[in-house]
Each structure stands twice: as structure tokens, then as C-alpha cells.
Amino acid sequence: MYIQLLCFFLFLFLLLQATMSKRSFKKFVEQELGSLPHFLIYTVLEWSLIVFLFIDGVIAFLSNQFAKFFDLNIPCLLCTRIDHILVPRDPQFYYNESICDSHKKKVSSLAYCHVHKKLSEIKHMCEGCLLSFATEKDSDCDTYKSLIGILHKDLELLIDDERDLPLAFKKDDNLVQTTKNLVDYKTNNIKNDSLKQHCSCCGELLKIKSEKLPKNNNSFLAPAPSPRVSHNKLSENESEFKDMDVDRTPSFVRGGNKFFGIPLSDSAQNSPRWSVRSLKKSVLNKTENASDTTDPTGESILNQLKKEVRLDKKSLIDLYMELDEERSASAVAANEAMAMITRLQAEKAAVQMEALQYQRMMDEQAEYDQEALQSMSSELAKREEEMKELEAEFEVYREKYGCLTDQEDAREEFHKQNGNASAYDDCQETKPVSDLAVSSSNQQENGENIDQNGQSKRSEESTAENVVSADEEKGSESKEGIVKELSEITERLSTLQSNGDLLKHIADVLDVSEGEAILLQISQNLHMLRSFVAMPSESMNL
């Protein structure tokens, strides 16, 4: 324990000395302490570093196993380092100084496949995995050429223009030997099929570059291609392209989902139609080259095959571009479809909630209306009972006081007499004063009539009092109406009494005969009025 503390303090002392002298720790130890202390100190430091790395490796292994066991993402070796947070450094430090030379060589020979998400050896990758990064924005042909050059392809097949090599006509004697060479070449290709390599990323077979035919100074003559045969081949290829055009992905997926309004490609050259046109052009170039070679030899056939391979590679690049474009289009369309589905589900849930709310409100309104109907039906039943009670009371009063036909006849007679009285008053106004003197003889008779009228007035007042006493026996519900009618009747009686006093005064002033006639008429009118006033009180009692 003491030895460890002593070593630790010694290390701190040496470190402080090195920092103060502005020299590195290694140079400080070599210059100040010598070679033996330098060896011992660095041995201890290396062993301590080994221990730290062992602990770090064990922790990293446990973290990886923990992530695999619980199906978590395995942590990255470079992202999990915290020294780039604690000590800011250049990002190149982690790739140049933190990695040894052997691993740098291995990493530099690897390429990333965007399709399979793997790092694989670039020399054994197929073109599909190698060109998986090709997108609409990154469509540089030079990049493809360089990548194919890394794959040990022949760059001259992709860079050089089509050119016809000069062919020489030789004798027919060399034809047999060239055919033998072709047969040997085919047998060698058949043997090499068993030695084909697989892609280090996806595992597919790699297209190995074909070996060149053994050159021979002796050339041969080959028959010129028939124009009919080339024309038939061209028509077959065109029919194949038509089938490809029919089986192609629909334009709304490739050019953008018109329903969602998302453009997916801006250039017309990246479209599948352009690729099919390029394929057609390549086939036409093949047929033209085949027709132009009038004197082919073995080398000319190889050149034609190389040109075909070059055109096929170009068409493959276009097809890869089309495939990547359609993949991106399908991914965007799927994302938009999922977004629309989620939006429709949210709208559906909102509509369902609103419908439930309206249904609840309608149920509450229906309950409220039902309660109102029940209350109205109960009130109607009460009113019917009251009507029945009133009808029973009406029958009782009818049996007690009789019908009202006599009272109606009296009302009609009263109206007729009122009309006669008004006519009589008009006639009295037109009479001369001499006629009044003639009727003075009847003054005594009129006085007697006045006495009789007074007696009739008393009898009518007594009948009115009887009516009032009968009305007081009614219930509390009709008292207010009866009181009002009685007040009106008393007012009318007071006015009639005042009119009677006025008539008496007029009779005293006027002649006896005329006054008696007027008083008689007035007494009749008062009698009719009293009978008319008595009728509504009786009707109220009924």
C-alpha cells in the first residue's frame, strides 16, 4: 500500500516537473533520470494502461451483451467515448490516432451498403451494393466509373467511345485454328463458373471479368451478319422493351404521389422512360455496329462484346437509379398514407365524440319534454275535474232557480221600451207649451203613480238586498266578482235616486199634467233598469 502511494506521488512529482519545464514526459524522464528509470517507469505505466483497458473491455463486453439480451441497439465504439466532450479535439483524431495501422488498412478497404446497412470489402461487392448510395441528387457518372475501377473493371469499356478497329482480311486457312481457340475459351469459362465469387455484402454471385482470347497473328474471315437476322433481333428487343414499359411501376408512384401533392423527381432523365429509351438506343447501337462491320475477325467480335458489356453496364446503372427512385417514392407514399390514416382516425374519433355528445343532449331534451308532457297531462286532468265540478254546481243552481229564458225575454222587452222612451222624449221636446197646459188635469193621477213607484222602488231594493244576501253565501272564489258587481249596482242605484230627486223637482216646477206624464215614464224606465240589474246577479248565483 505504501509502495503504491509512493509511486503515485512520484508520478505526480515527475508530471509537474515535466509541465513546468515545458517538455514532454518521456523526454523529461530520459534526460533527467536516465534509461533504467525510464524503462521501469514506462513498464509500470504500460501495465496500468493494460489494466485500465482490460477493465474498459470487460465493461464494453458486458454492455454489448446486455444490449443483445434485451434487444437494444448495440453501442457504437466511437460514440460511447466521452473524451471528445471532456477534451475538445479534432474529429480526425479518432480516425487517425485512436486506430492502429492494421485496422486502418482494414477499414479503408471496406465500403458501406445503404441497402443492407453493412460494411463489406469493396473488392468483393456487387455493383448493386456498391452503387446503393446513388440517388437523384447524386448521379455523377465519374463516381460510378471510379467505383467500377476499384472493382478491377476495365475502365476503357466505360470511358472510350465506340470505335471500329481496322480489320484485315486473311486467308481461309486460319479459320479452323480460331474456331479451336473459341472452343477452348468457352471450356475455360465453363470451368471458371465453379470458381465464381460471391458478394461480401448480399452473397450474390459476382460477374467476373472475362478473360481475353489468346491473340493470334492469324486472323480469320467471318460471314457478315444477315440484315434480316439483325432486324428480327431488333424487333424482339423492342417487344421486350414494350413489355418492360407495360410492367413498369405506374407514373403516380414514380413521379410523385399526385393525391398528396409531393414531387419526387425534378429531372426527366432519371425517369424510367428515359432509362428504357437509353436501352433502346443501346440496342440500336448494337445493331448498327453489327451491320457496320463488314469484315469481322476474332478481335472485332471481342470488341463488339466489350461494347455490348459497356452498354449493358450503362443500362444497369440506369436501372439501379430507377430502382432507387421507385424505392424512395414508395417510402414517401407509404409515409404519407400512414399520416393520412392517422389523421382520418383522429377525425373519426372527434366525429364519434361529437355524435355521442349530441346524442346525450337529445336524450336529456327528450327526458325534459317527457316530464313537461306529464305535467301538462296532470294539469289537464285537474281542469277536467274542475269542469265536472262546475257542471255539477251549474245543474244544482239550474234545478234551484230554473232556466234563464224569462230573463232573456225581459231583456228584450227592456230594450224595446228604451227605444219607445227615447222616441217619446223626442216628441216631448217638440211639443209646444200649450200642449203642456192641456195635460195638467192629470197631475193628481201622476202623483198617485209616483207613490206607487216609490213603493215598487222599496220592493225592488228589498229584492236587491235578498240577492246580496244570496250572493254572500257563495264560495271564496266568486266573492271578488260579486263585490265588484255589487259596487256597480249601488252606483247605478245612487245615480237613479239622484235622477228621481231631479225628476221630482222638475215635476214641481212644471205643470201638473206634464210632470205626471214625465214621472210616469221615468218610473217605468227605472223599473226596467232595476229588473235588468237584478238579472246579472241571478245569473252569477247560478
UniProtKB/Swiss-Prot annotation:
Which Pfam families does the protein's record reference? Answer: Zein-binding (PF04576)
Q: Which gene encodes it?
A: MYOB6
Q: Which Gene Ontology cellular component annotation is one that this UniProt entry carries?
A: membrane
Membrane-spanning parts = 39-59
Tell me where on the tree of life, at the top rank, the source sits.
Eukaryota
Q: How does it sit in the membrane?
A: Single-pass membrane protein
Keyword annotations for this protein, in alphabetical order, are: Membrane, Signal, Transmembrane, Transmembrane helix
Ranges of compositional bias, category Polar residues: 437-456
Native source organism of the sequence: Arabidopsis thaliana (Mouse-ear cress)
- Which coarse location class describes where this protein primarily resides? membrane
Ranges for domain GTD-binding come to 300-398
One MF annotation (Gene Ontology) recorded for this entry = myosin XI tail binding
Q: What is the lineage of its organism?
A: Eukaryota, Viridiplantae, Streptophyta, Embryophyta, Tracheophyta
Q: Where is this region: Disordered?
A: 219-239, 419-480
Bias-annotated ranges (Basic and acidic residues): 471-480
Q: What does this protein do?
A: Probable membrane-anchored myosin receptors.
Q: Where in the cell is it found?
A: Membrane
What is this protein called in UniProt? Probable myosin-binding protein 6
Signal peptide range: 1-21
